[in-house]
């Protein structure tokens, strides 16, 4: 393994671009290869068997690109168990941080909201992680099945999105929630709208920074952290290249990016 090798980042669609943004900011010397499986998004409503099969294809594709690390920029995939991938490949695998300590620090009365996909909410793992850190915490998990299709469909100014945000945040308002975590990497695309809906007294948190910090720790431990040169971004998707380029423009310095349409069955 060589420190000049790229870092792989994967997601079910465009959501992971929000994590790639943070990774690029915190690791400016690294090269990244991002894979968004836009042909089969969203993963949050898929069966576990389907999801594991899709992830296996992406991991195999990235392995052939000689990546030195893989960051799973998707909470649904992280919930399936990053541990099952560790040790089975010649690189470190980093999943999304649950952000428990970050949430508790931002919530004086320990009233916490979780916005996520149906799969992630059903797993119960975010709630368990928060309660393990503080058994007195009150956790309000809300599944948001409408968000990903609206974000992937670029419906950022639509009444449908405004209605969905109001619907999903209503339980938080009733409960007096003080901090909310965006436990799906798509949701930072609409973070400002969610913040506006909840008001200035509620902190809306994105776990991308904590995830990026985990990636840095793993690279340092393996002696693979680059400290010189300008990093490059390669953004790959399995469908809808033009749409991915537009959405990437909301998160990334597109002049530093190469975009390509890929077939995961070919390397």
Which residues are covered by each model-predicted region?
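Non-catalytic structural scaffold of enzyme domains
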Residues: 1-267
